Amino acid sequence: MASQSSQADQQQQQQQQSSQSQQPNAWEKAERKFANKNASEYYDPCQDFADRSLKCMKRNAFDKEMCGDYFQAYRDCKKQWLTQKKFS
């Protein structure tokens, strides 16, 4: 009787392993999705300029006039990036 239960346990483990190998886990799905996406969907090359703009705003009590150069640098970067994307 013990051999029957151990055989049943082994069969159950094999079924679980085969079903796990057939279905990729969530991490593998996400990894594949990320790898197949365009760079623009996850990466903004102008994010550094955006971060600097926000830091300037915080430093200057959210006075937009004090951070105009940062905003312009971000707009220029974004414009250049979108133009480059359009032609590639």
UniProtKB/Swiss-Prot annotation:
<dbReference type="GO" id="GO:0005758">
    <property type="term" value="C:mitochondrial intermembrane space"/>
</dbReference>
<dbReference type="InterPro" id="IPR009069">
    <property type="entry name" value="Cys_alpha_HP_mot_SF"/>
</dbReference>
<feature type="short sequence motif" description="Cx9C motif 2">
    <location>
        <begin position="67"/>
        <end position="77"/>
    </location>
</feature>
<feature type="disulfide bond">
    <location>
        <begin position="46"/>
        <end position="77"/>
    </location>
</feature>
<feature type="compositionally biased region" description="Low complexity">
    <location>
        <begin position="1"/>
        <end position="23"/>
    </location>
</feature>
<dbReference type="GO" id="GO:0033108">
    <property type="term" value="P:mitochondrial respiratory chain complex assembly"/>
</dbReference>
<feature type="region of interest" description="Disordered">
    <location>
        <begin position="1"/>
        <end position="31"/>
    </location>
</feature>
<keyword id="KW-0496">Mitochondrion</keyword>
<feature type="short sequence motif" description="Cx9C motif 1">
    <location>
        <begin position="46"/>
        <end position="56"/>
    </location>
</feature>
<keyword id="KW-0809">Transit peptide</keyword>
<dbReference type="InterPro" id="IPR051040">
    <property type="entry name" value="COX23"/>
</dbReference>
<feature type="disulfide bond">
    <location>
        <begin position="56"/>
        <end position="67"/>
    </location>
</feature>
<feature type="domain" description="CHCH">
    <location>
        <begin position="43"/>
        <end position="85"/>
    </location>
</feature>
<comment type="function">
    <text>Required for the assembly of cytochrome c oxidase.</text>
</comment>
<comment type="similarity">
    <text>Belongs to the COX23 family.</text>
</comment>
<protein>
    <recommendedName>
        <fullName>Cytochrome c oxidase-assembly factor cox23, mitochondrial</fullName>
    </recommendedName>
</protein>
<keyword id="KW-1015">Disulfide bond</keyword>
